[in-house]
């Protein structure tokens, strides 16, 4: 079940317009929700950091079923700024970016992109058809729970294509969402406090010599 905060998404993933006719109280409530959500996800990501001792070497534990993300080095985090694909290729980078999008109420964009990546790898015609329908009902159709912001013409084309699903059913929509994230959310992510903290090299403290 989607939370109330998640359903209150801004589909084009742009800053909320404070001039909208919803009143100052509604806007204040939205901003409070956003701050709470961001704090929650920053806490979760910090937990991943604290439970990852050595970059590049995952911690193993028989009792732990939760995937542990490895703390990136500052050098690795800096690579994410070189290209959007560098960020998406990093498991921790992807987790951090998803948290950022969730704080902006537009996590559906990265979820749709990831669903399309999985869809394109599907070989079975039966599974392809089933996944196509699920992606359509989750992200494309009107009033979908995670509806993405694409034009009506593209939506209509997808509705026709999924009748006989192929791996290219969502190509146009995926490119649209990728471009939206790359040109809109990605630059703001690079300017975020959380990302800047990851890029900082740890300060080396020296203990005073005993006399």
UniProtKB/Swiss-Prot annotation:
The keyword Transit peptide does not apply. It comes from the Eukaryota. Keywords: Cell cycle, Cell membrane, Cytoplasm, GTPase activation, Membrane, Nucleus, Phosphoprotein, Signal transduction inhibitor, Translation regulation. It is found in: Cell membrane; Cytoplasm; Nucleus, Nucleolus. Residues 79-116 are annotated as: Necessary to inhibit protein synthesis. GO terms for molecular function: adenylate cyclase inhibitor activity; beta-tubulin binding; G-protein alpha-subunit binding; GTPase activator activity. Its main location: membrane. Pfam families: RGS (PF00615). Phosphorylated by protein kinase C. Phosphorylation by PRKG1 leads to activation of RGS2 activity. CDD domains: RGS_RGS2. GO terms for cellular component: cytoplasm; cytoplasmic side of plasma membrane; cytosol; nucleolus; nucleus; plasma membrane. Residues 83-199 form the RGS domain. Residues 32-66 are annotated as: Necessary for membrane association. Coiled coil: none annotated. InterPro entries: RGS (IPR016137), RGS2_RGS (IPR034947), RGS_sf (IPR036305), RGS_subdom1/3 (IPR024066), RGS_subdomain_2 (IPR044926). GO terms for biological process: brown fat cell differentiation; maternal process involved in female pregnancy; negative regulation of cardiac muscle hypertrophy; negative regulation of cell growth involved in cardiac muscle cell development; negative regulation of G protein-coupled receptor signaling pathway; negative regulation of glycine import across plasma membrane; negative regulation of translation; positive regulation of cardiac muscle contraction. The keyword Cell division does not apply. Interacts with GNAQ. Does not interact with GNAI1 and GNAI3. Interacts with EIF2B5. Interacts with PRKG1 (isoform alpha). Regulates G protein-coupled receptor signaling cascades. Inhibits signal transduction by increasing the GTPase activity of G protein alpha subunits, thereby driving them into their inactive GDP-bound form. It is involved in the negative regulation of the angiotensin-activated signaling pathway. Plays a role in the regulation of blood pressure in response to signaling via G protein-coupled receptors and GNAQ. Plays a role in regulating the constriction and relaxation of vascular smooth muscle. Binds EIF2B5 and blocks its activity, thereby inhibiting the translation of mRNA into protein. This is Regulator of G-protein signaling 2. It comes from Rattus norvegicus.
């Amino acid at each position: 079940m989607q939370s109330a905060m998640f359903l209150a998404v801004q589909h084009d993933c742009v800053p909320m317009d404070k001039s909208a006719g919803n009143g100052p109280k509604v806007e204040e409530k939205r901003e409070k929700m956003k701050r709470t959500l961001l704090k929650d996800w920053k806490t979760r990501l910090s937990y991943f950091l604290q439970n990852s001792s050595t970059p590049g070497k995952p911690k193993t534990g028989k009792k732990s079923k939760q995937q542990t993300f490895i703390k990136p080095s500052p050098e690795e985090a800096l690579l994410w700024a070189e290209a959007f694909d560098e960020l998406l290729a990093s498991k921790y980078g992807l987790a951090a970016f998803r948290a950022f999008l969730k704080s902006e109420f537009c996590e559906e964009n990265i979820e749709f992109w990831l669903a399309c990546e999985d869809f394109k790898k599907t070989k079975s015609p039966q599974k392809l058809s089933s996944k196509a329908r699920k992606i359509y009902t989750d992200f494309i159709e009107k009033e979908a729970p995670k509806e993405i912001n694409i034009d009506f013409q593209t939506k209509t084309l997808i509705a026709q294509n999924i009748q006989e699903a192929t791996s290219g059913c969502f190509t146009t929509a995926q490119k649209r969402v990728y471009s939206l994230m790359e040109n809109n959310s990605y630059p703001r992510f690079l300017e975020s406090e959380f990302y800047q903290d990851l890029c900082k090299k740890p300060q080396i403290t020296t203990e005073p010599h005993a006399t």
